């Protein structure tokens, strides 16, 4: 796990987003995920490549930065249990990650996401894939990044010589533009891309702990970053699909029962990921019933 400050990661949400992405990738073309222009033939990927932060990352031994599942004995880690959203998508096609293999054959999912990553790190992650062989037109790529940027900007607002609110919002917008620029560059390299906007940081356990004013600013910063992603990515559903993670988090927080959630404000993990497992949850917490895994 990165020593850098990190935002709370979604618990139940990671699978809900995965379901949304699965619907996108199984439907008749990426156009069903959002974005104009229809596609006649369904897109069937030969590889999955994931970019982003801890929401999409693994440790070398397959641990996730969320609630980690255990085998039937209740003690042995099982990286396939409680899959993060990128695993849900990979599972549709029978793909596995090197960090969490499926079978003994070639693992056709590649995780480039890194814990603690910011918008500026996305270009580095993409370049790592370019150096390893690049992209092909049957590659499905996922991008979800920006939550750590929002926390960084919020921490700037608390400094003695804090930038103005307008300056912070503009900085968030620029992070969104930077992310969108890399998404469009991925398309130029031949990949099909699904972009997930980041959850509303103001609704996370850490965000709520900042008080009403702090949470409101975090929500505004989140909206500024996500908004620039949405208006700057290529608006062509043949190449780019969009999943609204921010709207999901807002709906889940407002009406948790709609997603079979019993808690949408507290962190499920009693210890910080990636050490968190289904055996180390807070009192009353469940991996599927609580929206947020972590609050650090």
For the regions a protein language model found, what residue spans apply to each?
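N-terminal secretory signal peptides that target proteins for export/translocation
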Residues: 1-13
């Amino acid at each position: 796990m990165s020593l850098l400050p990190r935002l709370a990661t979604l618990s139940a949400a990671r699978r809900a987003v995965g379901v949304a992405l699965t619907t996108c990738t199984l439907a008749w073309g990426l156009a069903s995920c959002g974005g104009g222009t229809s596609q006649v033939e369904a897109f069937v990927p030969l590889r999955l490549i994931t970019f982003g932060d801890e929401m999409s990352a693994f440790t070398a031994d397959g641990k996730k930065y969320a609630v980690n599942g255990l085998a039937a004995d209740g003690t042995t880690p099982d990286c396939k249990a409680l899959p993060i959203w990128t695993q849900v998508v990979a599972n549709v096609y029978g793909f596995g990650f090197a960090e969490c293999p499926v079978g003994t054959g070639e693992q056709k999912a590649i995780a480039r996401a890194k814990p603690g990553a910011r918008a500026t790190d996305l270009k580095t992650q993409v370049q790592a894939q370019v150096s390893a062989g690049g992209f092909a037109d049957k590659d499905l790529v996922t991008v979800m990044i920006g939550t750590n940027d929002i926390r960084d900007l919020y921490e700037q607002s608390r400094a003695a010589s804090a930038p103005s609110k307008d300056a912070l919002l503009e900085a968030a917008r620029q992070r969104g533009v930077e992310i969108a620029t890399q998404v469009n560059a991925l398309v130029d390299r031949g990949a099909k891309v699904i972009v997930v906007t980041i959850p509303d940081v103001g609704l996370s356990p850490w965000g709520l702990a900042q008080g009403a004013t702090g949470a409101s600013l975090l929500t505004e910063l989140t909206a500024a970053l996500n908004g620039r992603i949405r208006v700057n990515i290529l608006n062509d559903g043949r190449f780019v699909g969009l999943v609204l993670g921010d709207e999901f988090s807002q709906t889940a927080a407002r009406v948790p029962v709609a997603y079979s959630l019993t808690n949408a404000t507290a962190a499920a993990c009693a210890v910080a990921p990636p050490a968190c497992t289904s055996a180390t949850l807070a009192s009353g917490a469940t991996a599927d019933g609580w929206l947020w895994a972590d609050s650090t």
